[in-house]
Structure formats: C-alpha cells, structure tokens
Amino acid sequence: MKKLFILLVCLLPVLAQAQMETSVAGFIPLSGSGRIVYNFNPGWRFHRGDIKGAEAVRFDDTSWQVVSVPHTVELMPAEASGCRNYQGVAWYRKHFVIPQDMKGKEVSLHFEGAMGKQVIYLNGKRVQEHLGGYLPFTVQLTEQGVQPGDSCLLAVMTDNSDDKNFPPGKRQYTLDFAYHGGIYRDVWMIGKSSVAITDALEADKVAGGGVFVHFDNISGKKAEVYVDTEVHNSGKQTRTVAVETVLADAGDVPVKRVSQQVKLQAGESKTVRQRFAVRNPKLWSPDSPYLYRIQSRVKAGHEVLDGGVTRVGIRKAEFKGKDGFWLNGKPFGQLVGANRHQDFAYVGNALPNSQQWRDAKRLRDAGCTIIRVAHYPQDPAFMDACDEMGLFVIVATPGWQYWNKNPEFAKLVHRNTREMIRRDRNHPSVLMWEPILNETPYPRDFALEALRITREEFPYPGRPVAAADVHSKGVAENYDVVYGWPGDDEKADRPEQCIFTREFGENVDDWYAHNNNNRASRSWGERPLLVQALSLSKSYDEMYRTTGQFVGGAQWHPFDHQRGYHPDPYFGGIYDAFRQPKYAYYAFRSQSAATLKHPVAECGPMVFIAHEMSPFSDADVVVFSNCDSVRLSVYDGTESRTLPVVHAQGHMPNAPVIFKDVWDFWEAREYSYKQKNWQKVNMVAKGIIDGKVVCTYKRMPSRRSTKLRMYVDTEGKQLVADGSDFIVVVAEVTDDSGNVRRLAKENIVFTVEGEGRIIGDASINANPRTVEFGSAPVLIRSTRKPGKIKVKAHVQFEGTNAPVATEIELESIPSELPFCYTEEETDAQSAGAGLAGSPVRTERMAGKVVLTEEERQKVLMEVERQQTEFGTEK
C-alpha cells in the first residue's frame, strides 16, 4: 500500500476531509430548490448485438440481463489490447414509471456519455439521435406526452463501431486508445418547474445558457464576481420571478446574497447578470483548492421553483511568455503532471463517480499539479474532483491523428468544442482548452476557427487559454500556449508565448515495436520497475532544465490502459490498470515539497526504498525522498550511510538518492543461514530535515509464503450502495512477519458474502486472479442495499503448507439520491457471465476489419509517421 510511508499527522486530515460531491447536469443538488433528481442508473435490460424490433414496446426482453450503468458492453481481461474488445451495436431497454413527485415538472433524462452513436426510442417512437461518445445529451420526456404514474419503455441503441463521420473518427485498429462500448457514464432523471434555469448545452447559446460565473480584478484583498443566469419560462402564462444568487463559503455559510426580478413571457428566456464584490477572498490554488458555492434559486414569492449549486474557485491565472506561468499574482513555477485516459481494468471506461474521484486523488498524491485529459472531455465527476484536489486541467476536444476533409467533420469538431466549454467553463481547475485534434495535420483555417470559438465561448478576463501543437498550421503565430519540448524555449521567437510539453516520458525504439524503458508492467518485477522509475525521473528532470518561458509538461500516461493499434497494453503508468502503485509513483510523489499541507492529498515528508532485498536485487539501493538527506542503515544499523537529496537549481526538486554497493545476498545469508539471525537482515531509510528524523521506511527480505493479507483501496472514500459503485480489494502473499512475497506465484480465489458482488470471473482471468509482484486485486461492486460485505481469499490449490486464507470486511453506505427503476439486477452482470469470454470467435470477429500483413504494416506505418512528425519520439 502506498500510504505506508506517510506521516500520521498528515494522513489523518486526509481521511477526515476526503469528501466528494457529484454534480448532476452541471449542478450539485440543492435541498429545497424545487428541482428533483433521480438516479436513473439501475434496472436496464441489456443485449450485446443488433436485434430487429428491439425498440418496440412489446418486444420480449425477458431473456436479457438486467444491469446498472455505468456499464461496459463487455468485461475484458486486464490485458486485452489490439482491438480485442467488442465493437458494434448493443441495446439497452429500461422499463420505468414516472415518479408521482414529478407532477407539474418538466421531466428529462440527462445522459453524461455513451460510446459512439446512440439512437433513443421512447415507448417505441424514435425521439433522438446523438453522435459522439464523450459529451452529454438530454432526452425530454414531458415533451413526448408522458405524465407521472405512466409506465414507460426507453430503448437506447448504442454503436461503438468505427465511424469516420464524427470525432474522433479514426479506426480503432489504428488508435492509441479503445472505444469501449456502452452507456458508460451516469444517467439522471431531472424534474424542473416550468420556470427554471436552463441547461447550458440545451440552450445552445454562445457564452450563454445555464449559470456562467467569472471573476475580474482578483487579488488577496478583493475580487469582483459576475454571475450570469439564464431562466426559461416553458409555461403558457407570463411569469415574474426573482433570481437569487448566494455566494457561500465552503461550509455553506452565506458570504453575499443578491436578488433580481425578471419578467418572462410564455416561452421566453432571459439572462440575468449579477455583479458583486468579495472582500479578502480565499484564493484557489493547487495547494489550497478552496471552493466557494454559488447557490442559485428561482423564486416566485416565497416559493422556490428551481435551483442548484455551482462550486467555483477564485483564482487569477496568467501566462506571461518569458516570465512563465503566474497564479494569484505570483510566479508559480513548473506545471508538471500527467495525461489521463478513462480506462480501468475489466470495465473499460465504465468507472463510477467514486473511482473518478479516486483517480484525481491518486494523481494529486503523486504530486501532479496539472492533468491533460487525453484525448476527449472526461466524466463530470473527474472534473469535480480536480476542483477539490487542486489539479489544473487541459480539456481536449475529441480527436487523435485523423482528419476528414468533409466540411461536416470540422463542424462537428467545433460543435464538440463549444459543448465542452459550456459544460466545463465554471471549473476553477480548467486552465487551458485544447480545441484542435491531437497529432493531426489539419488546415490552417480549422485551427483559427477553433481558437476563435474558445474566445467567443469564454469572452471574459482570466479566461482559460487555448493550447495546440506548435507544428500545426495556424498555431505557432496565434495560440496562447504552444506544445513543444524543453529547449524550444531557447530558440522561441515569440516572447509572449508559453511552451508546454503535452506528453513527456516516452522513449520507444520505434513506433511499431514500442519497446521502451519507461514502460514496465508491474508483473515484470523489481528491475524493470526500477528502470522505469529512474527513466521517468530523467524525463521529469528535463521539465526543469529550461527557461521561464517553458512552463511544464504532462507525463504520458499515469495509468496502464488498453489500446487499439497495439497488442500490448500501455504499461508506462506510474500505477497499473487496477491503480496499484509502481516504483515510479514514489519517484513522482517525492517531488512534492515536504512542507506541503494539502486538505485532501497525501503530503508531508516521505521516504521510500525502491529495493526488495531479494536474491536477484541490485547491489545499489535507490531511495526516493523529499527530505534534506536520507540515512540508510542495514543489518540493524551495523552499516549506515547518509546522503543528501539533491535540490539543484534548474533540475527536478528532489533527485533520486542512490546508495552504491549496499546489498549483497551472500552477506545477508551470513546472518540468516549461519548466525540464525534473519531478523537482522533489514534496511531502514530515515528522512532528515534540519538535522531531525521526520519519516522512516523499513524493508526486510520476504521469507517463506505463509499467509494471505487483504486491504481495501478506499483512498478515504467508502463504497456507495447504488449498484454501480465498485472498489478494489487487494490480496497479498506475505511471510510470517507480513513482508510481501514479491516473487510468489499463486492464483487467488475470491468469494464474497453480503451486499457485494465480484466483477469478472475465470473467463477474463479475474477470479481466480494470478499474483503479480506479490498481490492480486479483485473488483467488488455494491448492491443497492447498504450493508456489510465480507471478502474472502484463498489460494486456488490449497494444501498443508500453502499460504493461509484470509478475509476482510467492509461496509457500503446509502446513496444520497433516490433511484428510479423497476427491475432488479441479475448477478450475471457482476460475475461477468455473458459479458466476458462467452462470445464465440465468429461473434467476436464479426464486423472487425481483417487485414493482410501488408495492409496492417501500411496503416501502422502511417501512425508511426504522424507520431514522429509531431515530435513524440522524445
């Protein structure tokens, strides 16, 4: 577990303050607001494949599975790259009743995201089509004539097949990520009054719709706040209402309250602008991500008709060219972080909100201050979490190495850009928009129009800037920030521009084989993981060997994930696909200042020994620390050395510490074999600041495998009983003293009792799960009933001297929002039956492109050409 080295004084506040709020269609629900929200995730009938008449009300779907969304069309093994995932049509059908408390409300369904193309039918009638897998869409129910108490049938056809007509457009077999299918994000049922705040995407107005908050004249003494609220009257009569805006602090205590009357004719919309000042504002920053709460209410007299909460952070971000990046009136230093794909072991893109939050926390734990969401807008829950964690975000429009000359394609790209800005514009975490297509040779007029749109959609001071690759037409001379490399700043001819590396850390032999010392599967063990950590440290160091004009970079990529165009998963993560940390995580973590006090992330002094003391371990011992120096003692202090942690100007904050010629297995054997004193074989690293020991890490060689041990990877966030949430439980093979047996080779069988289900089975190598580097993870999904869950683990083939079984208990908590569903989920979805491993080969290959070796070489050479052209060979 990565938390072992953290000081207790830092860890306790982390666990106490780890709070997650999830927005619904742009708003956090506000009690007593008049807006009703239901969780619409449970109770969907699912069928993978096309089937005639599946939209009809009388269609017999009783043989279909009942599942909850977020949902993937097919559970896959943890290593399933190379277009092994299903691509094609999949159907979802939901039988439901409009709740009675929706009487008098305008009822709609808000889909946060479903992959590819979607066609929606209500009660057998086709009502909508949506193109694209990364942005939300809304289905109006009341407009279709349904009323509270009505029994309804919603059918959704999804299709994640390759489609060149809408972004990203690229065929998956030439794509560096995967189009995992399904309704893979949340679905909400929302009831609003006839006079209500509009949805920014539905309103479809430039820099308008919904609630739009921006700030001006920001300092530590004062900030001007502007809140634009669009209200619509869908009724048949003229209404006069009050738009009330309350700025509250993080504890919901009002700081400022303003109200303004507005008269609306039937069918009319109006935007109300409210301006006020905040004295002595608490400014948002990565180290202190303070969030105010804008409470918006629409009132008719004392009755609240509609409302919601928008969380905002007051901060001033400036890119000053050769003077670098400034935050809140001060030089910030380097922005160093990572890219992020929304990919998780087994479930593909179908992460619940809790795992979105945990991912953001893991990235901030690792010392990241900026995340590039590559290559598409991410789940709203991830954006909410970035606000909480103090993670700056570069939001990218969907696209990767593909350009369609049909003018409609460019229009759809620009449409996506407008929608992503309207969705994410209030997040203080958003620092840059990336409105162009990644690594794509698009025409100059496209780049200029994309830039114009970002400025048109956010026309106020302090707006997020636009970033794009310096090699692309129309970018170098026009964009606010250009993507480049360390050293580009030395020859830059535009002093007003800042330079940022969009993807650092890649060192492939070529873009066909992808052999790379920065990519190491956790299963490969100690030596590859150490090489990866040191190689990434070198790349990290390059982000600091620059002038002020170079403002930072994002590592590619912090989480292992599946890809389309290569048979190997991407193994360059500092975490694996289950979010188990590698040595590289500690290399990144050690770059955070020891003095950092963060309200959520792990922080404070740390020291970590990247060495397993095995018979095959190196003689040199590498230690990662953010202290002044490290004292390494071996054999109960028989030998001891102290080395400084180098903090050189123009280099990474804390260089790895390498103790030469420390470990010798034969020397250790003298204690354990000849002296019968194996307890003396240990290493202790002590982090020292100002002459005092502030943190300690101890290693011992693992001895005989005797037992299993489990822990729950909560990150301080409990499992929610909503039928969609899941959590990772990890079983470790240990010796008598609890040292993890990294070289153990076992298969672990998991069972569960109570209100939990195991995701996956033997067909995807999920259960039993092979031990890798000492551990085997399992995914536990909640039911909709809160309660205790007991997880048990034992080795697949038990025996007298086999490791002893173990168990662990956790408890799920109630969901905050009510559910709307009529059918209970079948166990098969959690177990994986029918979802993974079941399709015969002919079904799995149906619809897939089968290439000759010559054809495959040709398309892969084109990918290689584009990646080389855009400079990613560095």
Predicted regions and their residues:
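Active-site-adjacent substrate/metal-binding segments within catalytic domains
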Residues: 71-98, 102-111, 115-123, 128-131, ...
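An acidic-aromatic loop/edge-strand motif
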Residues: 50, 80, 143-225, 281, ...
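Substrate-binding clefts and catalytic carboxylate motifs of secreted carbohydrate-active enzymes
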Residues: 36-56, 114, 179-182, 189, ...
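Accessory beta-strand-rich segments of carbohydrate-active enzymes
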Residues: 26, 30-31, 50, 87-203, ...
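Accessory carbohydrate-binding/adhesion or oligomerization-edge regions at the termini
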Residues: 19-77, 157, 161-166, 182-184, ...
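Substrate-binding/catalytic cleft of secreted carbohydrate-active enzymes
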Residues: 302, 358-362, 370-586, 602-612
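Beta-strand-rich ligand-recognition modules
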Residues: 122-171, 261, 265-269, 273-283, ...
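Beta-strand-rich binding/interaction modules
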Residues: 122, 222-263, 272, 619-644, ...
